[in-house]
């Protein structure tokens, strides 16, 4: 076996400046390929502070050990892992992309005129790769072991619960290999329907369990209010929304082994933030807005369908586009002005009347 210790030089990575690429040096890549050609059982030990690209050489080597930035006992730890005295159980704290162009900030960095726009917003790390369905080299939360683990019998303490009560996820984990080891169980939360744009799933809990060969243990991971909450810029606070969520239990962000559906009841009573510039879709999605505007919208819908020939899809076929999507995405005042001919009062008076009614319900 050949062991290659590959560390990024200071001109490639250091504090005080940003990396220009994800690559090892050309000399390091050439060394890996030459050694691996002569000795297929080559192990590459990486000493780096952030992900590196490996597509040029990873298929040529037998294994890669990510050592990150080690302390003075790092050498002993590496030896223990390579010689099997310790079973590795670490999981990646970030995604390893296939190439630089796949990364979330690629189009915005290094910026222009001395300014960088952080345009990725919430979609950083695995959240971005999940949403874009971008293939990666190694996903967030990934890590190998000298043994294997099976997940089964995932349960929750309650299938329906209030946000202030939270919920506890339990899953049975079995060591199906021949060596003692530790597994890090990860729980991701997927919101089936949100009032704001959210990533497909987010890590909200994890736990490490140590198992002997053939042993099974039940792992419990509690999820509290914040596990289901998101920051709402209009309300200027963390909020929850009532609805259905999927609790995804897995060994990494892409290796989901079990899933449980739950229903959350939000206990928050938020002030109404609807105004004339809120879209019809926002009015109908708001609990107070739906009460006030729902009957008016139903009347508008019936009159419009009749005007365009009736039927469930009459408007779409008559004017050749999804009329309702267009209408629902219009601000209240603009939509009422557009529909003025079918209204019983001036659109501005109706908008003011609706606003008065909706805020009286708070």
Task: For each feature predicted by the language model, list its residue ranges.
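C-terminal non-catalytic regions of proteins with extracellular/luminal or membrane-system context
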Residues: 1-362
């Amino acid at each position: 076996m050949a062991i290659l210790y590959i560390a990024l030089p200071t001109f490639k990575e250091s504090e005080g400046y940003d990396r220009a690429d994800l690559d090892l040096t050309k000399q390091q890549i050439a060394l890996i390929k030459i050694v691996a050609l002569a000795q297929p059982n080559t192990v590459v030990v990486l000493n780096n502070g952030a992900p590196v690209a490996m597509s040029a050489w990873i298929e040529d080597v037998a294994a890669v050990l990510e050592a990150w930035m080690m302390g003075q006992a790092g050498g002993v730890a590496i030896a223990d892992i390579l010689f099997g005295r310790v079973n590795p159980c670490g999981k990646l704290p970030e995604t390893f992309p296939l190439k630089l162009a796949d990364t979330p900030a690629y189009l915005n960095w290094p910026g222009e005129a001395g300014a960088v726009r952080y345009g990725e917003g919430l979609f950083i790390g695995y959240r971005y790769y999940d949403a874009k369905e971008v293939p990666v080299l190694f996903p967030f939360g990934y890590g190998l072991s000298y043994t294997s683990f099976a997940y089964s019998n995932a349960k929750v303490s309650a299938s329906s619960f209030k946000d202030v009560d939270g919920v506890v996820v339990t899953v049975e984990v079995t060591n199906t290999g021949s060596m003692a080891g530790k597994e890090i169980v990860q729980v991701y939360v997927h919101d089936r329907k949100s009032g704001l744009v959210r990533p497909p799933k987010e890590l909200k809990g994890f736990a490490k369990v140590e198992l002997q060969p053939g042993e099974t243990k039940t792992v419990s991971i509690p999820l509290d209010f914040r596990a289901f909450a998101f920051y709402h810029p209009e309300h200027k606070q963390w909020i929850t929304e009532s609805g259905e969520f999927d609790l995804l239990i897995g060994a990494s962000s892409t290796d989901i082994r079990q899933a449980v559906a739950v229903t959350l009841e939000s206990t928050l009573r938020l002030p109404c933030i609807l105004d004339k510039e809120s879209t019809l879709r926002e009015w109908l999605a708001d609990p107070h807005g739906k009460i006030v505007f729902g009957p008016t919208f139903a009347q508008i819908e019936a009159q419009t369908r009749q005007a365009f020939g009736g039927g469930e899809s009459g408007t779409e076929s008559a004017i050749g586009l999804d009329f309702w999507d267009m209408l629902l995405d219009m601000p209240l005042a603009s939509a009422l002005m557009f529909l003025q001919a079918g209204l019983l009062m001036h659109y501005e008076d109706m908008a003011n009347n609706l606003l008065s009614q909706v805020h009286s319900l708070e």
